[in-house]
Amino acid sequence: MKQQLKIAELLKRIETSKQQDIELGTYEIYLFSQNELEKGQIGYRYDKHQNSLISEENGKWKEEWIVIGYETDMGDPVFVNIDDDAYPVYTAERGTELWQPVHIGNIDEIIKQL
């Protein structure tokens, strides 16, 4: 998984602030630390055996989505689209056949809270 500058900035802020729980709109979110980020991709970018789950098919996990944490109430993934210069942040319901992202903010809003 390639490391993006904004993701690196987020991880650095988490490390220095020691804060991993934030609120973004109505969502309470746990953010992954540097040590948790790679493991946090399991079940989304790839399975536990490192087999890719990425596909360009509609409703499948996209290459440009990086999981940065999870919504603490339901455990749904919180992820950023690294191909968009605004670095929008989404969540989507786990356990469904298709991923249907819901926009909840952007990465700069998260960084400002740390």
Model region roles, listed by residue range:
Residues A92-L114:
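Compact, glycine/acidic-enriched structural inserts
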Residues V80, D85-E97:
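Intrinsically disordered, low-complexity regulatory segments enriched in Ser/Thr/Pro
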Residues M1-F79:
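A surface-exposed partner-binding patch
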Residues E9-I14, V89, I111-L114:
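Generic hydrophobic, helix-prone segments enriched in Leu/Val/Ile
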